């Protein structure tokens, strides 16, 4: 079973949690896109859902495949969000934001009664941090914000490169007009402390640590998909 087949298995298992009539947050990334494709097949057969996309990229795919969409302002309370992750630990703490949609992903997840994370087994880790932590920042005062992040990291015993994410034509810009600093801290022993410290920096719009948000993680491997509940 290759990586895409594992993503499809995880998406299939998540789809079993979606009931007709649900208000559904729809994530961003390659695994979430497999979920959208499967959801679209059910919608074509008469399955009723209303989706709130977490990125313009996801919105375009939903429109292309016929998944009905609303804005979060139109549906401010959601039943369920299904989204991918870059890393998942045993407590279902996550690193997200590799696709650049972390702010909207977190807003949509927070507006949902439940969040289900779907991923292949390569994303399951004992401790977060092998994947660089995306930190969404305001373009104004970028150097000052970067220095503040470095100071926070030093206080917590973390170090590593802080790289401003690039795209083909310069700095990567999120759907909200912000930039992303990818922080290669390595192992993050206290994700809660780092989350709190980053939240205190005025120039930090959001970060990719999702803590106490996921209710379930569906992890797919060669033997199929398994469901993990938070070990908190």
Swiss-Prot record:
Its EC number is 5.3.1.6. It is an enzyme of class 5 (isomerase). Keywords: Isomerase. The active site is at 105 (proton acceptor). One of its GO terms (biological process) is pentose-phosphate shunt, non-oxidative branch. Substrate binds at residues 28-31, 83-86, 96-99, 123. SUPFAM superfamilies: D-ribose-5-phosphate isomerase (RpiA), lid domain (SSF75445), NagB/RpiA/CoA transferase-like (SSF100950). It comes from the Bacteria. It catalyses: aldehydo-D-ribose 5-phosphate = D-ribulose 5-phosphate. Signal peptide: none annotated. Pfam families: Rib_5-P_isom_A. Pathway: Carbohydrate degradation; pentose phosphate pathway; D-ribose 5-phosphate from D-ribulose 5-phosphate (non-oxidative stage): step 1/1. Catalyzes the reversible conversion of ribose-5-phosphate to ribulose 5-phosphate. PANTHER family: RIBOSE-5-PHOSPHATE ISOMERASE 3, CHLOROPLASTIC-RELATED. Belongs to the ribose 5-phosphate isomerase family. Homodimer. This is Ribose-5-phosphate isomerase A.
């Amino acid at each position: 079973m290759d990586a895409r087949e594992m993503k499809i298995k995880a998406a299939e298992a998540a789809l079993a949690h979606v009931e007709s009539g649900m208000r559904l947050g729809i994530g961003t990334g390659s695994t979430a896109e497999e979920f959208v494709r499967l959801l679209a097949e059910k919608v074509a057969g008469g399955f009723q859902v209303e989706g709130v996309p977490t990125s313009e990229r996801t919105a375009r795919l939903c429109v292309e495949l016929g998944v009905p969409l609303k804005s979060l302002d139109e549906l401010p309370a959601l039943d369920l969000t299904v989204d991918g992750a870059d890393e998942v630990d045993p407590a279902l703490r996550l690193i997200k934001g590799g696709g650049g949609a972390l702010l909207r992903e977190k807003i949509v997840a927070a507006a949902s009664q439940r969040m289900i994370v779907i991923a292949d087994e390569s994303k399951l880790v004992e401790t977060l941090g092998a994947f660089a932590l995306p930190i969404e920042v305001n373009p104004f005062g970028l150097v000052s914000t970067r220095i503040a992040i470095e100071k926070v990291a030093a206080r917590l015993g973390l170090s590593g490169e802080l790289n401003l994410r690039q795209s083909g034509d310069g700095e990567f810009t999120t759907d909200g007009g912000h930039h992303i600093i990818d922080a290669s801290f390595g192992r993050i022993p206290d994700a809660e402390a780092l989350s709190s410290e980053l939240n205190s920096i005025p120039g930090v719009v959001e970060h990719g640590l999702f803590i106490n948000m996921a209710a379930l993680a569906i992890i797919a491997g060669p033997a199929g998909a398994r469901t993990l509940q938070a070990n908190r």
